Amino acid sequence: MEPSSWSGSESPAENMERMSDSADKPIDNDAEGVWSPDIEQSFQEALAIYPPCGRRKIILSDEGKMYGRNELIARYIKLRTGKTRTRKQVSSHIQVLARRKSRDFHSKLKDQTAKDKALQHMAAMSSAQIVSATAIHNKLGLPGIPRPTFPGGPGFWPGMIQTGQPGSSQDVKPFVQQAYPIQPAVTAPIPGFEPTSAPAPSVPAWQGRSIGTTKLRLVEFSAFLEQQRDPDSYNKHLFVHIGHANHSYSDPLLESVDIRQIYDKFPEKKGGLKELFGKGPQNAFFLVKFWADLNCNIQDDAGAFYGVSSQYESSENMTVTCSTKVCSFGKQVVEKVETEYARFENGRFVYRINRSPMCEYMINFIHKLKHLPEKYMMNSVLENFTILLVVTNRDTQETLLCMACVFEVSNSEHGAQHHIYRLVKD
C-alpha cells in the first residue's frame, strides 16, 4: 500500500463489520449496557484524541506495536473505565452513531438542493468521518456544529487524561515522540452548504493536501539502498518514500502543527528553521513524520549504493538550490547543497535529483541503527535525529519549500510510511 494514498475510508476489516440498521437498537450484554454513560464519555474523548485515520495504523513507540483507530478507542475505554469493549463493538457503535448523525443532518436541511448535495458528499465519507463533527463541518460547510468538550482540556494529546483518574495512562497517544499538538484543517463555511473541501476549479486538488505551493510542488521523494544480486539485477529497498498521488477535492486538508513546538529539533543559527520561517513565505513549510523501513539486509560490499531521489514540479522556469541538513540534538552535523535546472515536460517545469549519493555520515548512522537489538532503542536514537530539506530559488533566494523531517522505525510488515502536516505559527 502506498503510504501517500491513505484516505479517510475505512479499512477492509471495518467494512466487514458494517451492521444493518438493526444495530440502532441498544445491546445489553452487561448490567450497565455496552454504552453506559461512563463508557460513552470515554468513547467520545477517544474520538477527539484519535481522528479518523483510514487504513493508517498508529504506532505506540514504547511498545513497538501499531494499532488501528478502533483498537485504540477500545484500549482507551478500558484504561479509563476498567471495562472491556472490543474493536468490533467500537466499530458497530461508530456505524450506529454515523447513521443517527446522517439522519439528524438530513432532517435539518429544508432545501432539497442542499439536501441532495449533503447526501452526495456524505456518501463519500466513512462512518468514522461522519461521527467526527469536525469532518462533517469541513465536508458540508454546516456552520455552528458544536464540537464535544470533555474534562481535561481541548487538545488531542494525553494532557486530556487527568492524572490520578482510574486507568489513566501515558500509553494512550497517537505518536509517542510528538509532544506537539495537531490542529485540524480549518476551512471557512460557504453559504448554501457547498462542500468546503472543494475550492474553486482553478485551484488544483493537491494544493493544501500535499507538500507544495503555487510556485513549487514535491512530486516524489525517496531514500533507498540498492544492492547488486548478480551482474544483471539489483534489489532496491526504500528506507523512506513519498510517492506520487492523485489527490481529489474530497481528500482531507493537511492538519497543522505549531512550528514553535519543533524549533529545538532543528538548527537555530543563521539559516535555521526559525529564521527561514520568519522570512517566509509561511505556506511553504511542512512537517513530515516518517516511519522508516529498516527491514533489510545491509551488507558492507562495494555493490551497495545508498541514494536519495526527488522530483519537483513548477509552472515557472527557475534554477533551484536544494539543501539537505542532517541534524543531531538540534545541531547541524552535515549539509549537502545541490543545484538543479528545469526541464520542460508536458506543459510544466520539472526538477529531478536522481540517485544522489547519500553522505557517509548517513550510511554509518543507518548501519549503527540497524545493529541496535530493539526497535524502542532505535526510536530513542531517532528522537534526536532530524533532517531539514530546503528548496530555494537560486536567483531570488526565496524559500520555495521547506520540509522538517522527524523519524521513527516502521513495523516491518507495514513498510515505509509517512504523514504530512502544515507548519504554522498561531
Curated annotation (Swiss-Prot):
Polar residues: compositionally biased ranges: 1-12
Signal peptide: none
One GO biological process term: positive regulation of transcription by RNA polymerase II
Stretches the record annotates as Transcriptional activation: 167-426
SMART domains registered for this protein in UniProt: TEA
Keywords associated with the record: Acetylation, Activator, DNA-binding, Nucleus, Phosphoprotein, Transcription, Transcription regulation
Localization per Swiss-Prot or TrEMBL: Nucleus
Post-translational events: Lactylation by AARS1 promotes nuclear localization and stabilization of YAP1, leading to increased Hippo signaling pathway. Delactylated by SIRT1.
Biased composition (Basic and acidic residues): 15-28
Record's keyword annotation contains Transport: no
InterPro entries: TEA/ATTS_dom (IPR000818), TEA/ATTS_sf (IPR038096), TEC1_TEAD_TF (IPR050937), TEF_metazoa (IPR016361), YBD (IPR041086)
Single annotated GO MF: RNA polymerase II cis-regulatory region sequence-specific DNA binding
Modification Phosphoserine occurs at: 11
Chief localization: nucleus
Modified residues (N6-lactoyllysine): 108
Keyword Repeat: no
DNA-binding region per Swiss-Prot/TrEMBL record: 28-104
Residues bearing the modification N-acetylmethionine: 1
Location of the region described as Disordered in the Swiss-Prot/TrEMBL record: 1-31
Reported tissue expression: In developing skeletal muscle and myocardium, in mitotic neuroblasts both in the brain and spinal cord. At later stages of embryogenesis expressed in several developing structures such as the olfactory system, the intestine, and the kidney.
Gene Ontology cellular-component terms listed: nucleus; TEAD-YAP complex; transcription regulator complex
Subunit structure: Interacts with YAP1 and WWTR1/TAZ.
Protein name (record): Transcriptional enhancer factor TEF-1
UniProt organism field: Mus musculus (Mouse)
Lineage: Eukaryota, Metazoa, Chordata, Craniata, Vertebrata
Gene of this entry: Tead1
